Amino acid sequence: MAAPAAGSGPGGSSGGITGGAGGSLGVVGPSTSTSSVNPFLSDSEEEEDGGEEEEEEEEDDNEEDDEDVSPLNERPAASLASRYLQDEADSTLLPSAGPRLCLQPGEPGRVPLDAVAAQLLRDQLLLTALELHTELLESGRELPRLRDYFSNPGNFERATAAPPGFGGNTTASTGGQLNRAGSISTLDSLDFARYSDDGNRETDERVAENEVPLQERKNYKSSPEIQEPIKPLEKRALNFLVNEYLLKNNNKLTSITFSDENDDQDFELWDDVGLNTPKPPDLLQLYRNLSNHQTVSKDVADIAVGVIEGDLEPIQAVKQIAPDSHISQQAAIIKELEDKIILCNNEKAALLEQIGNLERQIESLQKENSASGVCSAAPPTSDRLQSQTSEESDHYIDIQITDSDAKCEGTEERLPFQQSECEPVCQVSEDIPPSPELAKIRKTTLLSAPPSKAGVHFDKPNRKLSPAFHQALLSFCRMSADSRLGSEVSQIADSENGVMKMLGRCLPHIVPNVLLAKREELIPLILCTACLHPESKERDQLLHILFNLIKRPDDEQRQMILTGCVAFARHVGPTRVEAELLPQCWEQINHKYPERRLLVAESCGDLAPYLPKEIRSSLVLAMLQQMLMEDKADMVREAVIKSLGIIMGYIDDPDKYSQGFELLLTALGDPSERVVSATHQVFLPAYAAWTMELGNLQSHLIPTLLSKIEKLLKEGEHGLDEHKLHMYLSALQSLIPSLFATVLQNAPFTSKAKLQGEVPQIEVTRFPRPVSPLQDVATIIGSREQLAVLLQLYDYQLEHEGTTGWESLLWVVNQLLPQLIEIVGRITVTSTASVHEFSRFFWRLCRTFGKIFTNTKVKPQFQEILRLSEENIDSTAGNGVLTKATVPIYATGVLTCYNQEEDRKLLVGFLEDVMTMLSLSHAPLDSLKASFVELGTNPAYHELLLTVLWYGVVHTSALVRCTAARMFELLVKGVNETLVAQRVVPALITLSSDPEISVRIATVPAFGTIMETVTQRELLERVKMQLASFLEDPQYQDQHSLQTEIIRTFGRVGPNAEPRFRDDFVLPHLHKLSFVNNQQSVDSKRLDIATHLFEAYSALSCCFISEELMMNHFLPGLRCLRTDMEQLSPEHEVILSSMIKECEQKVENKTVQEPQGSMSIAASLVSEDTKTKFLNKMGQLTTSGAMLANVFQRKK
């Protein structure tokens, strides 16, 4: 069992026992407990020492480092030895000798009890000493020596090299440790008491209570070492050893359960326990080596002054009183040594004063040269060393501190006997309440605040970004200063005084929280120390701890770490950021936990403003590119994209433009939607801003994306890759705000745009809602006020002065728009997704560039292409452009961007003209259908579309009326039932009585769609009556096209229609049509009807059909259809035969199951009764196995 750490005992001072007889007076080996009692000190000396120990007790109790150093006062050894030898000879020299009895001349010699106790302890006669202590305690004459010895549990935890009586020639090399008391050196009382699983670490009940007094056990239980909670490192190490032991002994299930209960630890790697932590032997080896366990000696040990055994006379020799001459000689030696001490102290004071003067000169020079990158961390030591003079103890050796760079912590380790300088500073800062202004710090203040340390300069990019765009770009940095801890992190100090104040504010929060996984509380301390520490190796270690502080940091914890990194960078400058922070990022770029890689990706963007410009465009860009290409986690790549956007706001090397473009294409093609979204929100706008400055937006970026779309259309003649088309087109759409900003910034009126007088207001709906602040035109320009002035001049210029000399706008009008319209004409109109994407693009383009631009520049170019006039109608081939995607994109993307009355009239007129021209030219209606489908998704256009269709219903041409009837089928699905009842059904009823049979036939699909979607019974009855008239009116008996259309409609809507409509109307009429088709004499018509009937029956076979309908209509209809297929299509006849057989089996199964159903009811009742009786009998049994077995015996 490990001994208590030096310096951590209750006393806090160091003590020890001099080993071996042959040694000289001097330093004793390492002590296992700082509160050990030196049996060679007198009572008065112990009291002095104890007083000093009490002053240091609180500080030493909290010390967790096992490497504390306790240097001792350099007091001449002879002084202490002579004082002890004079105890009985001259009581006048040492009046405070405690309970010793001075010998008077002529009296027989009497041994002092204190000397007896010292001898017993030295000879390890502990039981005798304990008995003596008990008797003295009962008589009221307690010896401090025995009291202190037995109250210190550390004296009973030392391993023994040999039992008492063996190896009596113990030397100083053994450390002078006391041997273990045999009564408690047992396994159960020692190791289980300290290393039990009990969270309170209380002493095991199996300690030999009869051999240890009650007070000793109480002291032992209340020892700080026992009550100290287990450290995280200790817990992980023990968990690992326990799991390893379980696996070696094939306790795999127990190991799995143990691993699940400790899921925060990786049991496969020892390195997960702790960095640079050596792995101990397994549990079995530790148990076997328990008897040989000894306290591990430390590199720097506690030191005490002792006396060689040879200098102590045996008890019998004490009776021999030394002669007076010898006493006077010893007194002279003591006086001489004391004079030397006084001289040394005087010399030390002079040197300290000289050191103080030199340090003040150094501090003044450092203030003058504050532009240096590394803050000087040498603490002033003059006050600290001067306080040593007044507080040093007589029992220790004087230690001269010559290292002017010693840290306050290091001094505390070397000088435990003096009050540390840090403690009073922290104590004072605790009395000062934190400023309430710290809680009001916001992220914008943190981002825009200049460096708080004079002389720190950062590379400013040679860019022309507006401050608003710059601020919006930096808003994506993952920082937070809106909380107490965020304020602490962002306000790190740059001087020793500031560090001390920070410690005073943060320590009260760290102490209660650090054991509850609140490790982010440590970030201010780590950062302050890393900022001010003079040694680069120590700074690297601290930053490594910062990045590894939390195993898997969540979003809030990452924000705290990144906020601290930015504050650190603002204080130390770009050189140290490059040398110290970036290597930490590089180390974790391939970490197994995505949260760590996410921290790296976010830090690259947050640190971008504080890095040298060469590093931004080389190392950091390469790191982010590697993570974008290789990382498999979507959230990591998303953070990479945002950091790339921030980097793009600071790169000013034109050679990196092409690399940025390749990264942009890679990001746009990422399979993760969140990565693509981050690209449109951050990366693309930031890259576009750089492209604008380089003048490449209109010369390279947009033309390149357009050429890729054209290439895609050429390669996709047999199948368009809609995903890539969406990727490039969405990128163009995100570039529209940047393109408009370029047009405004390069306009002829730019010099006139000055903020004077009242600034005009921008309409709320003037621009489409941006998906990101970086796509807001006002942000790109600089402010809404500046944009308002530019817009006013822009509209005036377009309306009155034109575009002469306006190169950027002329490029849009003369190159961009014609190329886009040409691309639109090559889009397949049946590709709904492509039509929708281009419609959104033109809608945003027109809304961004304004109504005047749309009316004067965009619409004329479309109208020139479409040429909507009756003289252009070609009845043989039709108008080719009207059948392309140009029609729906113009209608839904351009004509709908403004919703005033005149705009709606223009849209209605355009759709009416298209419907008329397509109908009269017998052209396909796909373009018109695409327009209706796209507009029908918005309920605001339903009335408008019904107006267009009513125009077709009352048109003089039967072709137009027929087209209107077919368009109703598309509109019914999205229109509410009120409009269907008021507008759609009356129009269809009108068309169903049209003189032209083709018009009447065209209404059938629309009636069928109503039956499929509407739930109002009145409407359904009206539709049912109209369809019945088509089927039963003799004038339609020979209308082959009508019959075909009705059968096709039944097959489409039958499975989704109301069951009553399907059972009462659809199936009986299909049976009738199948029977009539058997008498058809024309084979072509007979086969056409039969084919449509086969498709309708195949669709309806999946529906539930009652037995009556199956027998009366479904099966007879299938048999009639099989008769047709036997003669006309044998391949269909095989399928029909299997369908008929399957239906017949279903009917037979239902017939057979009916009588079985009544029997099954009776059987279920019997089984329930049997089950009840069985359970009742089972409940009457006891747990006897024999009685339970009797239940299942056969009756005889």
UniProtKB/Swiss-Prot annotation:
Alphabetic keyword roster = Coiled coil, Endosome, Golgi apparatus, Lipid transport, Repeat, Transport
Q: Repeat as a keyword?
A: yes
Which PROSITE patterns does this chain map to? HEAT_REPEAT, LISH
User: Which residue spans adopt a coiled-coil conformation according to this UniProt entry?
Assistant: 333-374
Segments of this protein annotated with the region Disordered: 1-73, 159-180, 195-225, 370-393
Give start and end residues of every HEAT repeat.
Answer: 620-659, 984-1022
In which broad location class does this protein mainly occur, judging by the first location in its UniProt entry? other
GO BP of this protein: intracellular cholesterol transport
> Source organism's superkingdom?
Eukaryota
Mark out the compositionally biased spans (Polar residues). 169-180
Q: Where is the composition biased (Acidic residues)?
A: 43-69
Can you say where in the cell this protein is located? Recycling endosome; Golgi apparatus, trans-Golgi network
Extract the InterPro entries matched here.
Answer: ARM-like, ARM-type_fold, HEAT_type_2, LisH, RELCH
Q: Which parts of the chain span the membrane according to its record? A: none
Where composition is biased (Gly residues), the residues are 8-26
Basic and acidic residues bias locations: 195-219
Entry GO CC: recycling endosome; trans-Golgi network
Tell me which residues make up the LisH domain: 234-266
Compositionally biased residues, Low complexity: 27-37
Its function? May regulate intracellular cholesterol transport.
* UniProt-listed PANTHER family: RAB11-BINDING PROTEIN RELCH
* Name of this chain's protein: RAB11-binding protein RELCH homolog
Query: What organism is this sequence from?
Result: Xenopus tropicalis
